[in-house]
Swiss-Prot record:
ANK repeats lie at residues 631-662, 666-695. It comes from the Eukaryota. One of its GO terms (cellular component) is cilium. Disulfide bonds: none annotated. The lineage of its organism: Eukaryota, Metazoa, Chordata, Craniata, Vertebrata. Expressed in retina. One of its GO terms (molecular function) is zinc ion binding. A zinc finger (DZANK-type) spans 230-290, 359-407. This is Double zinc ribbon and ankyrin repeat-containing protein 1. PANTHER family: DOUBLE ZINC RIBBON AND ANKYRIN REPEAT-CONTAINING PROTEIN 1. One of its GO terms (biological process) is eye photoreceptor cell development. Involved in vesicle transport in photoreceptor cells. Coiled coil: none annotated.
Length: 757
């Protein structure tokens, strides 16, 4: 423990250890002792589990903190005791917490005969000393055995201490007893002579030296001490003996017995300057003409000092003939603008409708809404000893929260103002009438502005422009016309929709085809490279094929080469058109379903010269000659753009005979289809079932690892999955690039780091 710290208190039950019971199991007759190894400390404790607060003031709410005086007894139940030791210089120790399981045990009662005799002996001396003899009291002591409840309540009342809250039910039982008041006087000396062997109760810890008393004794003590404390908040009774309400909680307090109103004190009489009548000087206004007496009580100075000028910068008084301050050398105001302070007389400011408030320290008249005096800085409206109730005008303590005479809340009222706002707050009429014509307003000549202290000030306006309404309207018209020109010049781009309308809306169908073709070209760099190479002429034929799952649209354009343009020879290209093959020469086939078979059958009859003229890059987009089985088609759909890549569906299709190396209509393997559509979770399933991870596809010969690298950040997870499946990182495409080279070319550091690992 560090030097100067306070030792934590110890909570010890005073009993002999009983076999079969834990240390925390006690009864209601077991006393608890609290002590600390540090000398000269006070111990504060609580019984409801809350933190002990020894700094809480009386009347500030419910107080559950008690000061330890002597061993205490706990009520039955599970009680949590928290204690803290506090030294005289307010150094605190740590808080000690102990939980006791208290069982009810009947109290050990003293026989009624012995108890009555001891009580009679204890109080007979007091009665003889005070000159009172109570025959009724002896009669009550004979029936003490029938009033055990008073003994219990007294046991709780015996240790009551100032600043702690008592049990309201106990006070109620004692306060509303039917026992009459036997002994009218109470002296502390008599109570101090009583034996002191009763334990301290947690609710009352400050009336020491009491033993179990009967109902008559308790009633006498309660009647004689109840007026000293408020029954609701236990705050001290107001010092005013005629106060009817508690100044802390506002509850009614009983009157003091035997007190009468004192005779009125003689007030100082004086002559009113307005009406000339002799009136008391302790009233704010004249009782005859209602003129204010505060200005009349201020003495007039007979000696005057020389004129001086107050510096506006530092507030120093300077002789009137000087032009610069002797302290700060600032420019002094001219003579016609100066404030003159002659002798001890303070300046008087102009008022509104003659309403002013006088300072209690210097007597200066201030504006009615001022909070502090303009001359001495004192707070206005607050006396040095008491505050005034705005409703009844009674004097209360400065810290009083409620008025002792009428009981209204006065905590927020810091000073008294003679206006209607306080009357609204207090809920009553104004305490004083409005000032009449006898109220003299104070007029001070206003200072004239100085002509020599004027300065020309300017502000920068360069660059600031505020357009007019016509100019704003003109700009709006120009912006509208510019938008119209842009709309006319821009190409028509149809809206990209998920499903085309069909049902004969051929224009919307063409817009749908155009929008999706543009989107497909933007997302596929290989297709962009192929579609950008050939030079096409006019569209010569177009066919549409439907097979129940897909819709195939074939467009045939005239291919234009540089040789045909510059030789200017007429060539019969009708035999070399692709439409002659797909459409059967001079006419179309009657059935669209035979289009693929007819094309595959006629391609073998095409001359060798036609085969040489064909672009070898277009073979990747030819239809797959091998028909797809239902399992392979469903597998490609699951890893395609419309699929979800569900592992359970893929495993079921592979179990049913789907080929993991099957290709779609574009010739892409299933692994590459899964990579392009970002179904990276399907790659390990296909690899375990025999899929070729390093299979190349397309005109550039890219593998699945190349395709995943081209996706950038979106394909980073696919790259990690392929590397986990032992994909060949040294595999090169037709351009001689590995997947790592593509990542470096794209500047993708995150993907490059995967290859480095």
């Amino acid at each position: 423990m560090t030097a100067g710290s306070v030792c934590a208190p110890q909570i010890i039950p005073l009993r002999v250890p009983q076999p079969g019971k834990a240390n925390h199991e006690i009864d209601t007759n077991t006393l608890l002792e609290m002590k600390s190894d540090t000398p000269d400390v006070n111990i504060y404790y609580t019984l409801d589990g809350s933190k002990p607060d020894f700094l809480k003031k009386v009347g500030s709410g419910e107080n559950n903190t008690f000061k330890y005086i002597k061993p205490i007894a706990l009520p039955d139940g599970k009680i949590q005791v928290k204690a803290v030791a506090v030294s005289k210089d307010c150094r605190q120790s740590g808080i000690v917490t102990k939980v006791f399981q208290v069982d009810y045990e009947p109290p050990k009662m003293v026989s009624s005969e012995d108890h009555g005799e001891d009580a009679l002996k204890g109080f007979s001396k007091q009665e003889l000393k005070n000159g009172f003899v109570g025959p009724k009291l002896r009669k009550k002591y004979k029936n003490a055995e029938n009033k055990s409840t008073w003994n219990v309540n007294l046991r709780r009342l015996a240790d009551l201490k100032v600043g702690e809250r008592a049990d309201p039910k106990t006070l109620k039982d004692l306060r509303f007893s039917e026992s009459p008041l036997e002994i009218p006087a109470y002296h502390e000396g008599a109570s101090a002579r009583l034996p002191t062997h009763q334990a301290q109760s947690p609710g009352f810890a400050h009336i020491t030296g009491q033993k179990s008393l009967t109902s008559t004794e308790v009633m006498r003590i309660q009647r004689e001490t109840d007026f000293l404390k408020c029954a609701h908040c236990l705050a001290s009774r107001p010092s005013d003996p005629f106060a009817r309400f508690c100044q802390e909680c506002g509850a009614p307090v009983p009157p003091i017995f035997g007190y009468r109103l004192p005779p009125p004190e003689g007030a100082q009489m004086g002559l009113c300057a307005e009406c000339g009548s002799m009136v008391p000087m302790n009233t704010p206004i004249c009782v005859v003409c209602e003129a204010p007496l505060a200005p009349q009580l201020r003495p007039q100075a007979s000696l005057y000092l020389k004129e001086r000028v107050i510096c506006r910068t530092c507030g120093t008084g300077n002789p009137a003939h000087l032009r610069y301050c002797v302290t700060c050398e600032g420019t002094l105001p001219p003579t016609q603008e100066q404030w003159l302070c002659n002798g001890d007389e303070v300046p008087r400011l102009p008022t509104r409708n003659g309403e002013t408030i006088s300072c209690s320290r210097c007597g200066c008249q201030n504006l009615w809404e001022a909070s502090f005096c303009d001359w001495c800085g004192a707070m206005l409206g607050i006396s040095a000893s008491h505050s005034v109730c705005p409703k009844c005008g009674a004097s209360n303590h400065l810290t009083a929260r409620f008025c002792g005479s009428c009981g209204i809340y006065v905590k927020s009222i810091t000073r008294f103002r003679m206006n209607n706002s306080l009357a609204i707050v207090a809920g009553g009429p104004r305490p004083f009438p409005e000032p009449r014509s006898a109220w003299q307003s104070l007029n001070v000549p206003l200072p004239t502005p100085a002509t020599g202290s004027k300065k020309d000030m300017g502000t920068q306006t360069s660059g600031l422009f505020y357009p007019s309404g016509k100019l704003l309207a003109k700009k709006e018209l120009e912006a509208a016309s510019h938008r119209q020109r842009q709309e006319k010049m821009s190409d028509h781009r149809p809206v990209l929709t998920a499903v085309s309308p069909g049902r004969g809306y051929w224009r919307k169908q063409l817009d749908h085809i155009s929008a999706h073709l543009r989107s497909y070209a933007q997302n596929n760099p290989e297709f962009r490279a192929l579609i950008a190479e050939p030079r096409m002429g006019k569209l010569i034929s177009a066919t549409v094929h439907e097979d129940g799952y897909e819709v195939s649209i074939r467009l045939n354009y005239i291919q234009v080469s540089n040789k045909n343009l510059y030789l200017n020879k007429s060539m019969n290209l009708s035999d070399h058109f692709l439409s002659s093959v797909t459409e059967g020469g001079n006419g179309l086939y009657g059935s669209r379903s035979s289009l693929v078979s007819a094309y595959s059958q006629s391609i073998s009859d095409t001359p060798e010269s036609i085969k040489k003229m064909k672009n070898p890059k277009a073979k990747s987009f030819l239809a797959n000659p091998e028909p797809l089985t239902p399992e392979n088609r469903l597998l490609l759909e699951e890893v395609g753009s419309t699929g979800k890549g569900r592992l359970s569906v893929l495993e079921q299709l592979l179990d049913e005979g789907a080929d993991p190396n099957c290709c779609d209509s574009q010739g892409r393997p299933a692994v590459i289809v899964a990579v392009v559509n970002k179904h990276f979770e399907a790659i390990p399933v296909l690899a375990q079932r025999g899929a070729d991870i390093d299979q190349q596809w397309g005109p550039f010969g890219n593998t699945a690892l190349h395709e995943a690298t081209l996706l950038g950040l979106e394909g980073r997870e696919s790259v990690a999955t392929l590397l986990g499946c032992n994909a060949n990182t040294q595999k090169k495409n037709t351009r001689g690039q590995t997947a790592y080279d593509i990542a470096l070319e794209m500047g993708d550091d995150l993907t490059s780091a995967l290859f480095a690992d």
